[in-house]
C-alpha cells in the first residue's frame, strides 16, 4: 500500500488513525514478535523496517504516516539494543523520494492542487531533489540487501536515510 493517504488531519476520523497505526506500526511489531525468538536461538537475524524520511523531517500532508512511523521507530530503538547481544540487528530504512506508485500519486495530487499538468509536477519535484532525480527501487533494494547481510552485525538500532541527500541536517 505504501502508507496512509495524505491530507488534512481534520479530515481523518478515529478509524483512519487506528488503521494507520495498525498498518505502519503494530503490523511490523507483530511480525518482529513472530520471528525474533528464532533469530535469537540461531544467534543471527536481520530485521529491516521500511519507514519514511518523514521520521526525521515530517511532511506536512502526511500526518497519519508521520505519527505511526515515528512510533515504530521509537519501539525499534529500544528493542534493537535488547537483542543485539544475540547477533540480531534491527534497523530502519527511511526512504525519501523513490520512483513508486505512491510517489506518483502524491505528486499527481500536488499537481492538481497547484493546477499544473502531471509532467510539470514531476519535473518540479525532481528539481527539488539534491540530485535532480528520484531514487530507484533497485538502489533502495541494494541498500536493504546490504543491511540484511552478515557484514552488518555491528549496525543496529539505526535509522538510515535513503533520500539522495534531501535531508539537510547533520544529526
Explain the meaning of each model-derived region:
Residues 84, 89, 155-157:
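Short, small/polar-rich loop/turn modules that mediate ligand/substrate recognition or access, typified
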Residues 48-71, 76-85, 97-98:
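Catalytic loop of short-chain dehydrogenase/reductase
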Residues 32-33, 77:
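A short, exposed helix-loop element centered on a Lys and neighboring polar residues
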Residues 8-10, 16-21, 47, 125:
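Substrate-binding pocket helix/loop in short-chain dehydrogenase/reductase
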Residues 117-118, 129-140, 151:
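A conserved structural motif in NAD(P)-dependent oxidoreductases
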Residues 57, 145, 156-171:
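Short C-terminal tail/terminal secondary-structure segment
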Amino acid at each position: 500500500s505504501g502508507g496512509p493517504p495524505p491530507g488534512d488531519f481534520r479530515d481523518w476520523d478515529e478509524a483512519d488513525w487506528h488503521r494507520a497505526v495498525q498498518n505502519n506500526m503494530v503490523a511490523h511489531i507483530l511480525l518482529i514478535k513472530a520471528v525474533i525468538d528464532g533469530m535469537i536461538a540461531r544467534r543471527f537475524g536481520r530485521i529491516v523496517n521500511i519507514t519514511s524520511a518523514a521520521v526525521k523531517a515530517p511532511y506536512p500532508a502526511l500526518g497519519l504516516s508521520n505519527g505511526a512511523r515515528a512510533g515504530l521507530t521509537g519501539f525499534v530503538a529500544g528493542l534493537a539494543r535488547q537483542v543485539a547481544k544475540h547477533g540480531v540487528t534491527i534497523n530502519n530504512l527511511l526512504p525519501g523520494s523513490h520512483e513508486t506508485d505512491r510517489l506518483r500519486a502524491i505528486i499527481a495530487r500536488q499537481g492538481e492542487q497547484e493546477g499544473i499538468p502531471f509532467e510539470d509536477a514531476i519535473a518540479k519535484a525532481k528539481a527539488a531533489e539534491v540530485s535532480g532525480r528520484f531514487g530507484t527501487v533497485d538502489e533502495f533494494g541494494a541498500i536493504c540487501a546490504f543491511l540484511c547481510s552478515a557484514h552488518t552485525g555491528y549496525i543496529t538500532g539505526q535509522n538510515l536515510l535513503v533520500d539522495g541527500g534531501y535531508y539537510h541536517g547533520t544529526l
